[in-house]
Each structure stands twice: as structure tokens, then as C-alpha cells.
């Protein structure tokens, strides 16, 4: 597993993660994204950048924000439990070779742990963008997964440093897929 903790090295590791995303997209796979609270908003920004043009006109790219549909989230939470809100969707929508992109600002939510386990069951690579030094996520990741750890103490500061503001999705993802 690749793990990064120094902010100055984030761009090259974001590039590494983007190569996995590009590879999945070029193989007709999709990106599933999730996060809780403010991280759900960051997940939505990534999804928008993929589905709609980002800085220039180009074809839409397949991305599903698992945190976006409040009716689905509340139905799953009501009928099952809150811990299942992402994993249940991933089990229905995810396929081997897809990417699960997780934004987590430092909390240790059980719903994130469950979606990681579900991703591994379906052979979906996890890219986790985290902000917690001793969190729950890191031990759950496999060798094929990628963790980009933004080592900041404040969840607001972590949101400020999210990859959307650091050219994520990177230019090569936007250019390479548009050329297909």
C-alpha cells in the first residue's frame, strides 16, 4: 500500500492515484466516491468534475457519489443501519476493477469501514484521502489500495487541502480520457 503523510509530496502521489483512475476509466470501469459530512461535499465536487466538463469541454466520465442521494441514504439507514449506507450501494453498483474513492477528514466512521470491506470483496481498489494519523482506515487497506494522508489537525484544514484544489482529477486524467 502507498501511504503519504507529508503535504509537500502529495502532488506526485495524487498523480499515482490518478493513474489508477485513468486505467479504470480506460477499461470502461467507474469511480464510486463517498465521504461523510464535509467530506461528502468534497466527494460531490469530484463527481461533478468527472460527470461535467472540468475547465474544458470533454465527454462525461463515469462517477457515482454514494453520498449524494439523500432518499437512498435515509432508506438504507432506516431499513438497515447507518453503517450500511455506502456498502449497500457499492455492492449493488460496484464491479471488479472499479475504483472506490473515499474522502475522510479524520473521523472513524463505521460506514467507511464497511464500504472498504465491501470494496475488497468485489475486488475494487480503494483510494482513501484521509486526515487522521491514527485512524481506522489505514489498517483496513490492502497492498493494492492507496492512502493519501493529509497530516493536518483540523478537519477544516484537511478540507482546504483536498485534492480537488490540488488538481484532482489531474490534467492527465482529463486529457487522456478526452482523447479516447
Predicted regions and their residues:
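A short, well-structured juxtamembrane/interface segment
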Residues: 6-27
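Glycine-rich phosphate-binding loops that contact phosphosugars or nucleotide phosphates
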Residues: 32, 39-40, 44-179
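N-terminal hydrophobic or amphipathic segments with adjacent small-residue motifs
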Residues: 22, 29-32, 37
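Short glycine/proline- and acidic residue-enriched helix-loop micro-motifs
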Residues: 1-5
Amino acid at each position: 500500500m502507498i501511504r503519504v503523510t507529508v503535504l509537500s509530496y502529495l502532488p506526485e502521489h495524487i498523480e499515482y492515484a490518478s493513474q489508477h483512475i485513468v486505467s479504470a476509466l480506460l477499461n470502461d470501469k467507474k469511480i464510486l466516491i463517498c465521504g461523510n459530512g464535509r467530506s461528502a461535499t468534497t466527494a460531490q465536487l469530484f463527481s461533478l468534475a468527472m460527470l461535467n466538463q472540468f475547465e474544458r469541454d470533454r465527454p462525461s466520465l463515469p462517477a457515482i457519489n454514494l453520498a449524494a442521494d439523500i432518499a437512498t441514504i435515509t432508506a438504507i439507514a432506516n431499513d438497515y443501519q447507518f453503517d450500511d449506507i455506502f456498502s449497500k450501494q457499492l455492492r449493488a453498483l460496484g464491479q471488479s476493477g472499479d475504483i472506490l474513492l473515499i474522502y475522510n477528514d479524520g473521523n472513524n466512521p463505521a460506514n467507511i469501514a464497511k464500504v472498504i470491506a465491501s470494496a475488497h470483496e468485489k475486488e475494487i481498489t480503494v483510494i482513501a484521502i484521509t486526515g487522521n494519523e491514527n485512524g481506522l482506515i489505514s489498517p483496513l487497506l490492502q497492498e493494492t489500495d492507496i492512502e493519501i494522508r493529509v497530516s493536518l489537525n483540523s478537519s477544516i484544514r484537511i478540507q482546504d487541502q483536498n485534492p480537488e484544489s490540488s488538481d484532482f482529477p489531474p490534467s492527465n486524467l482529463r486529457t487522456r480520457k478526452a482523447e479516447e
